[in-house]
Amino acid sequence: MSAQKSAGIQLLLDAEREATKIVQKAREYRTKRVREARDEAKKEIEAYKAQKEAEFKKFEAEHTQGNQAAQEEANAEAEARIREIKEAGNKNREQVIKDLLHAVFTPSPEAMAAH
């Protein structure tokens, strides 16, 4: 009976070893699949990111041109307005200076109001 028990125990030990090998292979396979899935996800994320960056650059380029044209137009209008103001200032400059000097240096006999 001892030989039968020994053979039965040996059979159980062999089955346990075989089961351990199967479980270990399953774990290794699962770990490998997780790594592959992670790598695949990274690649998809990078591709999606590159696509969105390209779309953003295209959008930015299209809208920057419009903004640039508006900026140039605004600059031209500002320059024209500055020229007008300078011309108006130069036109009446002498008279304004005379009026200011006259007002500052000519005393007027008016009483000051008390506060």
UniProtKB/Swiss-Prot annotation:
Whether Transport counts among this entry's keywords is yes
Q: Report a single Gene Ontology molecular function.
A: ATP hydrolysis activity
State the compartments where it is located: Vacuole membrane
Q: Does the keyword Transmembrane helix apply?
A: no
Report the family membership: Belongs to the V-ATPase G subunit family.
Main location class? membrane
* Membrane topology note: Peripheral membrane protein
What is the role of this chain?
Subunit of the V1 complex of vacuolar(H+)-ATPase (V-ATPase), a multisubunit enzyme composed of a peripheral complex (V1) that hydrolyzes ATP and a membrane integral complex (V0) that translocates protons. V-ATPase is responsible for acidifying and maintaining the pH of intracellular compartments.
Q: Which GO terms describe its cellular component?
A: vacuolar proton-transporting V-type ATPase, V1 domain
Q: Which UniProt keywords apply?
A: Hydrogen ion transport, Ion transport, Membrane, Transport, Vacuole
Q: How does it assemble?
A: V-ATPase is a heteromultimeric enzyme composed of a peripheral catalytic V1 complex (components A to H) attached to an integral membrane V0 proton pore complex (components: a, c, c', c'', d, e, f and VOA1).
Q: Which domain of life is it from?
A: Eukaryota
Specify the protein name. Answer: V-type proton ATPase subunit G
Q: Which residues cross the membrane?
A: none
Pfam families given in the database record? V-ATPase_G
